[in-house]
A protein has these predicted regions:
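Conserved acidic donor-binding segment of nucleotide-sugar-dependent glycosyltransferases
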Residues: 153-165, 174-179
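A charged, aromatic-enriched C-terminal amphipathic alpha-helix characteristic of glycosyltransferases
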Residues: 180-210
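A conserved mid-protein helix/loop that constitutes part of the nucleotide-sugar donor-binding site
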Residues: 38, 45-64, 78-84, 126
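Short acidic/histidine- and often glycine-rich active-site loop of Leloir-type glycosyltransferases
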Residues: 130, 143-154, 158-159
């Protein structure tokens, strides 16, 4: 920090890309996404912080517009019944499915083509990095903190205004109609993960530790 004449170095949490890829390629039968053009997934605790209501309301707009979309929500928490009630009340159970957290979430993530994060705030959301490892397009709330940094201010995915249902639905529509652009963004996002490489970051930790031995 320049104010205190202190040298600082940012080292991100190590990301084990090879393990995520191995787990993601585990074969299993899962037919929910069959026939859908947009295969969206959200993995988060069912709490107010994760703002599933914004996600569900945006998806409802798209369903009413006859957009071919399915959404898988994976998690657990106090808001589960609230989420289930919304799905039931709006009769969208054919398009939206809830499952509990899984021992291997990556094989479900691999089946999707779009990851959506709607949090009101985060730290550094590892789930975005995991989605990038498995080469999924990301749409995330521009919440404090983490998503903007990970997605390089929109270079490696789409950012929408937090709690803005219309903005989120429009970002999903953009994803639906821009396949070539999406593939380019996914490719660049995957390459950007060198910042979080497991071996590289572990070496950086060891270098710092050695200075104090």
């Amino acid at each position: 920090d320049k104010r205190f004449n202190i040298n600082t170095k940012v080292i991100y949490n190590p990301l084990n890309k090879s393990e995520i890829k191995i787990l993601g390629h585990k074969k299993f039968k899962f037919t929910f996404f069959d026939g859908a053009k947009i295969k969206a997934i959200n993995i988060a605790r069912f709490t107010d912080q994760k703002d599933h209501m914004t996600l569900l309301k945006a998806i409802l707009i798209l369903i009413k517009k006859k957009i071919n979309i399915k959404l898988l929500i994976m998690g657990y928490g106090t808001n589960k019944h609230k989420i289930q009630n919304f799905i039931s009340k709006n009769k969208i159970s054919k398009n939206v499915k809830i499952i509990n957290f899984q021992k291997n979430p990556y094989k479900f993530l691999k089946k999707s083509n779009l990851f959506i994060l709607t949090s009101l705030y985060e730290g550094l959301p590892n789930v975005l990095l995991e989605a990038m490892v498995l080469k999924k397009y990301i749409i995330s709330s521009n919440c404090p903190t983490g998503p903007k940094e990970i997605l390089a201010n929109g270079k490696f995915g789409s950012l929408f205004k937090t709690q803005d249902i219309k903005d989120l639905s429009n970002k999903i529509l953009d994803f639906n109609y821009n396949v070539y652009k999406n593939n380019k963004i996914i490719h660049n996002a995957s390459k950007s993960l060198t910042r979080f490489d497991f071996n590289t970051n572990c070496e950086e930790y060891f270098k710092i530790i050695k200075k104090f031995i």
